[in-house]
């Protein structure tokens, strides 16, 4: 299955609880942390919810 590289670019402090949970679900822990996740609808939904805190490479 296709994978996507997701990097956290902004801090998660003072953010909505659901947005923090999305970052946790993607496996992101700190600014500059990069993970590879599978390209699934659920992961895409989490990325779309926190688009302003992450950068995405396909």
From Swiss-Prot:
Q: Which InterPro entries does this chain map to?
A: Ribo_uL30_ferredoxin-like_sf (IPR036919), Ribosomal_uL30_bac-type (IPR005996), Ribosomal_uL30_ferredoxin-like (IPR016082)
The source's domain of life comes to Bacteria
Keyword Lyase set for record: no
Gene3D superfamilies in the record: Ribosomal protein L30, ferredoxin-like fold domain (3.30.1390.20)
GO BP annotations, alphabetical order: translation
Instruction: Please provide the record's keywords in A-Z order.
Output: Ribonucleoprotein, Ribosomal protein
Q: Does the keyword Lipid metabolism apply?
A: no
An example of a Gene Ontology cellular component annotation for this protein is: cytosolic large ribosomal subunit
Q: Name one GO molecular function term.
A: structural constituent of ribosome
A Pfam family it matches: Ribosomal_L30
Q: Which family does it belong to?
A: Belongs to the universal ribosomal protein uL30 family.
Task: Provide the assembly information.
Answer: Part of the 50S ribosomal subunit.
Q: What is this protein called?
A: Large ribosomal subunit protein uL30
Originating species: Acinetobacter baumannii (strain AB0057)
What does the record give as the organism's lineage?
Bacteria, Pseudomonadati, Pseudomonadota, Gammaproteobacteria, Moraxellales
Q: Which gene encodes it?
A: rpmD
């Amino acid at each position: 299955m296709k994978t996507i590289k997701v990097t956290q670019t902004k801090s998660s402090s003072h953010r909505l609880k659901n947005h923090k949970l999305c970052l946790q679900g993607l496996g992101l822990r700190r600014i500059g942390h990069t993970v590879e996740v599978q390209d699934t609808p659920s992961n895409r939904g989490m990325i779309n919810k926190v688009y302003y805190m992450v950068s995405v490479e396909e």
